[in-house]
From Swiss-Prot:
GO biological process, one term: uracil catabolic process
Protein's recorded name: Pyrimidine monooxygenase RutA
Role according to the record: The FMN-N(5)-oxide reacts spontaneously with NADH to produce FMN. Requires the flavin reductase RutF to regenerate FMN in vivo.
Binding, FMN: I68, K69, N134, E143, R159, Y160, S209
Catalytic activity field: uracil + FMNH2 + NADH + O2 = (Z)-3-ureidoacrylate + FMN + NAD(+) + H2O + H(+); thymine + FMNH2 + NADH + O2 = (Z)-2-methylureidoacrylate + FMN + NAD(+) + H2O + H(+)
Organism: Shigella flexneri
Length: 382
């Protein structure tokens, strides 16, 4: 396989501008993000995620994030049928780490904002101010129908109205310890939360629709987006540009953090063979479920996250951007990611998390010009 990314050279000023943060998307669900019978098969456990978070911290990753998933896709691999809960997992990880930032995901249809505010303040205390919250509106209807809390399909078109009220309650409670917010979805009557977080609580989101980006531009500290394609590291640039345009309306600085899967080995050819092997084992039954669910939302337009996830181009890993190559090739492609205006960081998954993080820290990160500021630290831990 030929290197998809040309070698880049940067001046010192460029290196400073292109300094990029790295996060790990910990596998809270079984089998991580590969919907394949040929991929590693494993259950989510605290011990596994503890080892991943500690290894990521060892190699100076900046943050760890867990999603929330309440119902999986089934199939031969029982994909995401087995999941831990995000806040309790991240509270545990906060207690066994010391530097890395920790983010949990709130499925906002399942948790009142006042409860999330208090849980977040608690994990802020556990972590010493290293905690933040990822807010999701919910796209997979069966997750909520199974509990009898799906608000009806009109929710698809009103979900960011709901989330806007939700985050206003959170900001009230974290900022002042009190909320009397009155809206269409929430009514607070002298609602109290104390103690408040020790530092301002970070709120993140993953909006790719126009409504999602408008929300992030107004309320989020940064916004996640999907990478696109295989070995096309800058293909997400139009999405990052849309996010920058959205912030022009609010006057806020909200950077994009891009989701990629890293599959790396000694050579490009060896890694390409591994990627083709994963694709050959695609769990078609689970993928059919994903496609079916992506078609339930007929009201939000064509630019939502779930529409990209179900695209058949690379559905075996939910169509996140995929970087497949030698350690040097992956390092060059990640430097290309850093060159995109508005891209402040990446959120990484791996085909094998423990070995993947180790080889990233030992073999890839030292070659990345956008991580050159860590050279002294990586020499210490190598």
């Amino acid at each position: 396989m030929q290197d998809a990314a040309p070698r880049l050279t940067f001046t010192l000023r460029d290196e400073e501008r292109l300094m990029m943060k790295i996060g790990v998307f910990v596998p809270i669900g079984n089998n991580g993000w590969l919907i394949s019978t040929h991929a590693p098969q494993y259950m989510p456990t605290f011990e596994l995620n503890k080892a991943i978070a500690q290894k990521a911290e060892h190699y100076h990753f900046d943050f760890a994030l867990s999603m929330i998933k309440l119902r999986g896709f089934g199939g031969k691999t029982e994909f995401w049928d087995h999941n831990l809960e995000s806040f309790t997992l991240m509270a545990g990880l906060a207690a066994v780490t010391s530097r890395i930032q920790i983010y949990a995901t709130a499925a906002t249809l399942t948790l009142p904002p006042a409860i999330v505010a208090r849980m977040a303040a608690t994990i802020d205390s556990i972590s010493g101010g290293r905690f933040g919250v990822n807010l999701v509106t919910g796209w997979q209807k069966p997750e909520y129908e199974q509990m009898g809390i799906w608000p009806g399909d009109d929710y698809f078109s009103r979900r960011y109205d709901y989330l806007t009220e939700y985050v206003q309650v959170l900001r009230d409670l974290w900022g002042t310890g009190k909320s009397d917010f009155k809206g269409d979805f929430f009514t607070m009557n002298d609602c109290r939360v104390s103690p408040q977080p020790s530092i301002p609580m970070k709120v993140i989101c993953a909006g790719q629709s126009d409504a999602g980006m408008a929300f992030s531009a107004q309320y989020a500290d940064f916004n996640f987006c999907f990478g696109k394609g295989v070995n096309t590291p800058t293909a997400f640039a139009p999405t990052a540009a849309r996010m920058k345009q959205a912030t022009e309306q609010t006057g806020r600085d909200v950077g994009s953090y891009v989701l990629f899967m890293v599959i790396a080995d000694e050579t490009d050819d060896a890694t390409r063979a591994k990627w083709e092997h994963y694709k050959a084992g695609a769990d078609e039954e689970a993928l059919s479920w994903l496609t079916e669910q992506s078609q339930k939302d007929t009201r939000s337009g064509t630019d939502t996250n779930v529409r990209q996830m179900a695209d058949p181009t690379s559905a075996v890993n939910i169509n996140m951007g995929t970087l497949v190559g030698s350690y040097a090739s992956v390092a060059r492609m990640l430097d290309e990611v850093a060159s995109v205006p508005g891209a402040e960081g990446v959120l990484l998954t791996f085909d094998d998390f423990l070995s993947g993080i180790e080889t990233f820290g030992e073999r890839i990160q030292p070659l990345m010009q956008c991580r050159a500021h860590l050279s002294a630290l990586t020499q210490e831990v190598a």
